[in-house]
């Protein structure tokens, strides 16, 4: 792999954004890493040009919603998959299809039946995803330009560190404005609300800017919907080394599962993980450099 070195300032910016569970302003980022707002803005612009962006990792439970995972051990045709409420679709080379849907907490059963009726096939497994774990990358993998190495001691330290549950948040009603905000933040965590307003305005029938801002502050921020910010490093990694996209499904006790997930998601290229602690299952997706695969297998073993 070609050596890829980011400046220490850029790594500090990435590191800070990866550590917070809210959307900071440019001035706040600069203050936290000891840079001026203008320098911080230039660094973010430079990172974007290198395909390093930032997305919000969201916990929809704080909006009164839940996510369900349906696993099919067959490759389903795209046209048979119901699109309403669909959050993500993953099809692996091994022939597994994973469908993730969002629904209201009290409508899980009816939503599962809706999907099954549309597809016409019973899934092999169904899970209600009750926990989202945002990845906390070990920045030395980026700083040293060494995405082809795993620093086990660092990964184990990340996994073993205490992770307080944090304060609980109230859930109230959810409406299309909230969902639109979540969709925009999951594409770009640093997007300005005025740009969200412009985007929604193109569709038509949009409330005022003040209404959208109120929803953002009261429904998104105060309810703790944003649980982390993830640098999107997949394209950056793919530019500089041969990678394979892998789906990782893990099973175990709640404690071992949480520890294992936090360890592997400290590796750049891994995305947020979704868990059902009661059932003891978790899954995440990653763009993994080919040289890392044997080491990850050994680490998980």
Task: Walk through the language-model features, giving the residues of each.
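A compositional/biophysical signature of low hydrophobicity enriched in polar/charged and small residues
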Residues: 1-301
């Amino acid at each position: 792999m070609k050596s890829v070195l980011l400046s220490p300032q850029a790594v500090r910016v990435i590191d800070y954004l990866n550590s917070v569970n809210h959307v900071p302003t440019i001035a706040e980022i600069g203050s936290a890493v000891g840079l001026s707002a203008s320098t911080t803005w230039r660094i973010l612009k430079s990172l974007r040009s290198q395909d390093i962006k930032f997305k919000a990792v969201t916990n929809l439970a704080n909006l009164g919603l839940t996510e369900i995972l349906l696993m099919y051990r067959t490759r389903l045709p795209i046209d048979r998959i119901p699109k309403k409420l669909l959050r993500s679709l993953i099809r692996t080379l091994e022939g597994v299809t994973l469908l993730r849907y969002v629904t209201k907490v009290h409508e899980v059963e009816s939503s599962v039946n809706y999907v099954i009726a549309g597809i016409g096939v019973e899934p092999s497994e169904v899970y209600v995803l009750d926990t989202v774990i945002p990845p906390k990358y070990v920045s030395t993998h980026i700083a040293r330009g060494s995405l082809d190495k795993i620093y086990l001691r660092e990964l184990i330290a990340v996994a073993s560190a205490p992770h307080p549950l944090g304060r609980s948040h109230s859930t109230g009603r959810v409406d299309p404005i909230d969902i639109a905000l979540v969709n925009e933040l999951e594409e770009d965590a640093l997007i300005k609300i005025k740009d969200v307003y412009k985007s929604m305005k193109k569709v038509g029938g949009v409330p005022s800017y003040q209404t959208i801002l109120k929803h953002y502050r009261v429904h998104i921020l105060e309810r703790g919907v944003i649980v982390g910010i993830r640098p999107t490093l997949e394209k950056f990694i793919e530019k500089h080394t041969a990678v394979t996209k892998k789906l990782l499904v893990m099973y175990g006790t709640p404690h071992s599962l949480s520890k294992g997930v936090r360890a592997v998601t400290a590796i750049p290229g891994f995305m947020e993980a979704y868990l059902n602690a009661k059932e003891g299952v978790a899954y995440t997706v990653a763009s993994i450099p080919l040289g890392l695969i044997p080491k990850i297998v050994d680490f998980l073993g």
